[in-house]
Amino acid sequence: MSLHISTMNTRAANRMAPAILFVLSFLPCCHAQTIRPVISEYTAKVAKGSIELVNPGLTPLTVIIEPKSFSVSEKGEITYRPLDKGIQLKLSTMSFRIPPQQSYFIFYEARADVLPAWFVIYASIGGFQKNTAGMNIRLDLPHTVYILPKHSVDKQDIIINSLGPTLDKTHLSFSVTNTGPWFGRALSTELIGKSGATPSSGFPIFPHCTRIIEIACKGSEPKTELRLHLKNFKMEQPLSPAEGTFKCAP
């Protein structure tokens, strides 16, 4: 029997936290395999980069590299597919071994017929000792690449709408739509109240796509607006009086 573990988007991981904790209990202790950087963005015709894979354990590991294209749904769920034909990728290697307590570097060169473009380079890691349940384990670690034009998303291309509270009344939902052809990234988000802000993580804003985000709301203090921080500007979406006085679940 084998156990295959992949990373996933943050909200999906939160929903599956109990299952993930169960799965991670099968991993050998003292192992904290790392891929870095996790994300790389390039504003050049040819993206030239490298990936470092770290094996801090005491046994050698085998690694198989698999590039994939992907798309992201409104709720942040990722769907993978074979690498698009419009992306040309050269890798220094497709498989290798990492000795114990050492690192291995992969070098790559990528270009795309149309920009913006994005893809992921997955490192599928094996060689772990079988755990007490007799399972073989493979761990998938992603390195995501964005090849972008110099022009990023325009402020007028982004539309924010409030969708109200979630069913469990612990979050407020918003849709963020990019109506333009350029890629952008929300570096962070904030739900603003009279006495302060509730921060939340950022997310990519893909061309001609909508993303639904959920931000935790705490206490009964009225909320006044949603704020997105992008590289060159910020967006503010005021809340209506009815939305602002919504009481979150304790």
Model-identified regions with their sequence ranges:
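N-terminal secretory signal peptides that target proteins for export/translocation
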Residues: M1-A13
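Bacterial N-terminal signal peptides
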Residues: P18-F26
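Beta-sheet-dominated interaction scaffolds and their linkers
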Residues: A32-L58, S95, D154-K169, G202
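Short, solvent-exposed loop/turn segments enriched in Ser/Thr/Gly
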Residues: T43-S50, Y104-F105, L115-V120, L139, ...
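Surface-exposed binding patches on compact interaction domains or structured appendages
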Residues: G57-S103, K194-G196
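Short, acidic/polar linear motifs in exposed loop/turn regions
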Residues: G57-T59, T177-W182
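Short Pro-Gly-centered flexible turn/kink motifs
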Residues: F96-A110, H208-A216
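Terminal connector regions
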Residues: A112-S152, P222-P250
